[in-house]
């Protein structure tokens, strides 16, 4: 059985890890980096770029460079969060036929899981290159506050990438794994504050180590799936746009190229201000008007940045209060605070968390890598490589159905340990009702329409009877991935209807299969391209080598042989410019055959040089023989002195 890899599929950056011996190890990608930007670009020649290469060309290709796709995964186009992103994203967000939020690239609509799959494929390839064997199984992390649709969409992305997703695990829980496995002794209550690129989570976790076995029990979780570093960047971008407008009278929001440069500069400025008190945003030729080119040079201080994002940092503490209350713990009962996510490097965030908990957060957990490392540990637990860890995670939001009066009736309350199963009996609302619609909801609001609709299905064939008499048993079953399976049964007739919730939207199995086939076709195309490049390089090397040998052969090469070789060289050089691998290989072979005489001459010259060198060496060594003799004094050692 191969390794189960751990993948942190982040909004801004992604990371892959494996369990190496007893410790989780983060794997460096092809560029030598331990994290990979979650950026995908579609180039004009049809090539798909992922990670750093995609980020590098973003400024010149803003409409076809996709980032922060995790903010769209599993979301409806009409969601408030999506509508807000519509105004700030340089790429087109479109409404899918099923009402989901998709993106449009070069006139083609694409689902977020399909795009995220490109990042997962890069993570898969990174692991395969390191391990030297195929990888087919993974544990993928999601924000703890992701709903059912978002979890299902993440699992779909894994499937499209050619991965069997063995488990979806919550990011704060994974970070606690990285912190707690092999380190914690006894019992500790830990708060994991996870502020990443696009999402925020807080989890209160009890870690208990008894006789070498460590139990991780999530007591409560809360969060905001649309709050993160991207929002901090946007505040800086807005500030720079307003300042430039005030100084130059030009609104950069209308210039996509300028906005992309600004995004890059805003992120860099924000990062620099974590260690410096001020920084300059210097962007020459940011735009131009009738008077000529315009340059941006704006000073941003740490105090200014903090004033721009202060409300968001404060907002992040509200879910912390709720999670603490739900866990039944007081602030003083928390033993350790762990910071996860790149945005927690900001001093203001660290101070806000330290002030809230009354203690300094731990510094021994890498905020960018802990989640992937924890996922790798979970992978080892699932494969049986690690047996001394037990995880008890929870469902982040209440799950229920719509009942009479458009009320949501919860069957499974939030923060219930998973996997779990719960049944409840309901009845009809009208006399002689022959069918009921089971409308599945997720959320904490009383009014059904204020919650997230996960899907609905009908139970038909109910025997006519007065309202309230038929007994319909609804069962909710949540698996270890936090994904919901629902069934409804008429207790009198035993008629049953089951569904795995795929949301009222989501991708169908057919759509996923089509995307899997497309991904496989892309992989085959990539392999063909790689082989073509290798063949070109080999042919190029041969051309260079033959030309050098022609020069060295000089007059020794007969004229008709030289003409033949020159013709073969010319044909191979033409073939190298094309895309036909077989043609390049054929012309390569033709050149080798035409160069037979040249090879013989080169061999003869090498042998002649070798022989001449040997003769010269022999005569010089005999001449030096006497010079090399040194008179030495010596003493004979008798046996009895030994």
Curated annotation (Swiss-Prot):
Induction: By stress conditions e.g. heat shock. GO terms for molecular function: ATP binding; ATP-dependent protein folding chaperone; unfolded protein binding. InterPro entries: ATPase_NBD, Chaperone_DnaK, Heat_shock_70_CS, HSP70_C_sf, HSP70_peptide-bd_sf, Hsp_70_fam. Keywords: ATP-binding, Chaperone, Nucleotide-binding, Phosphoprotein, Stress response. Residues 601-642 are annotated as: Disordered. Residues 628-642 have a biased composition (Acidic residues). Residues 602-623 have a biased composition (Low complexity). It comes from the Bacteria. The modification Phosphothreonine is found at residue 199. PANTHER family: HEAT SHOCK PROTEIN 70KDA (PTHR19375). Acts as a chaperone. Belongs to the heat shock protein 70 family. This is Chaperone protein DnaK.
